[in-house]
Design a protein with these regions (language model features):
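ATP-binding pocket architecture of kinase catalytic cores
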Residues: 35-134
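Conserved phosphate-coordination/catalytic loops
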Residues: 2-5, 28, 59, 116
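Juxta-kinase regulatory segment immediately upstream of eukaryotic protein kinase catalytic domains
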Residues: 1-20
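A general marker of short, structured functional hotspots
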Residues: 6, 30-31, 111
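Short, flexible, glycine/charge-rich loop motifs used to bind or transfer phosphoryl groups or to couple energy/partner
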Residues: 11, 24, 78
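Short, N-terminal intrinsically disordered low-complexity segments that are rich in Pro/Gly
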Residues: 1, 23-24, 54
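ATP-binding glycine-rich phosphate-binding loop
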Residues: 20-35
Length: 134
């Protein structure tokens, strides 16, 4: 079975009875791939992470996400996981990038607010750091 077929089968078993479509959401500098799942019934979209276990262990990602959450940073909620297959179902934080949001000219103070939020999150993560943990 191809990897994408495995992902679809896992998602179908995780969300029984929900018809969904998958579309590429983004990529990062690893072997992980991300897909946005949209649902026929209009339920909120979700992000599905595919991290092939022979190339990428999702446990460090889960650990860092929890540390960031504990520090007050806005991170996706883990809704379901299959560590053996390397699949995670996550809340969807949206498709707007920071750059796109910064280019929005409807509010002259928007950039200042976005930068303040980002710096606040970075400071919170820094203050929550502990040697050997975060």
């Amino acid at each position: 079975m191809q990897r994408l077929e495995q992902l679809r089968a896992w998602l179908a078993s995780t969300l029984p009875g929900q018809a969904f479509d998958l579309a590429p959401a983004s990529a990062d500098a690893s072997f992980r791939r991300y897909f946005r799942a949209t649902f026929a019934d209009g339920s909120p979209s979700r992000i599905v992470m595919d991290a092939p276990p022979e190339k990428e262990d999702v446990r460090p990602w889960l650990h860092v996400a929890e540390l960031f959450r504990a520090a007050g940073a806005h991170v996706p909620e883990v809704l379901a996981q299959d560590l053996e297959q390397g699949f995670l179902l996550l809340s969807d934080l949206g498709s707007t990038t920071y750059l796109q949001a910064l280019k929005t000219q409807d509010d002259p103070q928007r950039a200042a607010h976005l930068y303040a939020d980002a710096l606040g999150s970075l400071a919170a993560i820094q203050c929550a750091s502990r040697p050997g943990v975060l």
